[in-house]
Amino acid sequence: ERDCRVSSFRVKENFDKARFAGTWYAMAKKDPEGLFLQDNIVAEFSVDENGHMSATAKGRVRLLNNWDVCADMVGTFTDTEDPAKFKMKYWGVASFLQKGNDDHWIIDTDYETFAVQYSCRLLNLDGTCADSYSFVFARDPSGFSPEVQKIVRQRQEELCLARQYRLIPHNGYCDGKSERNIL
């Protein structure tokens, strides 16, 4: 029987922000409740000279069911006692996008090919998660080797999210576009 209490989930040991920095392509995601980036999602993580991590992300969002825009999101990360667990404050460059302050956990990464991120926004009384989201990131938008896919699938199962992810297309929709020159 798998333990699905969020407090039991393991994260990346000795997580190294500096090695994690750079460009990551979202290959799959498990959605939370509410408006969220849909596809063509690319995140850029950076670490400043004081060791503070921040990120920008771009992706396609569908508004009002039929209006597609490329949205820019910004996030700042506050460290916690565990180097792989952050509080992420995020907001959209445009006011209609979601903003919030979520847990942002790096469940696993090899820094070179893949990363699995997890966030629980709301706990059930039994300690399991009522509203979570998770991204599988790749350094290369063409995806993973079978060996890496196996590790990623295992991590998804450990998060009690097996078969709840959908693949994210990268078809160039947002290349060179941002909401500033679409809206």
From Swiss-Prot:
Disulfide bonds join 4-160, 70-174, 120-129. The modification Omega-N-methylarginine is found at residue 121. InterPro entries: Calycin, Lipocalin_ApoD, Lipocalin_CS, Lipocln_cytosolic_FA-bd_dom, Retinol-bd/Purpurin. Detected in blood plasma (at protein level). Pfam families: Lipocalin. GO terms for biological process: retinol transport. GO terms for cellular component: extracellular space. It comes from the Eukaryota. This is Retinol-binding protein 4.
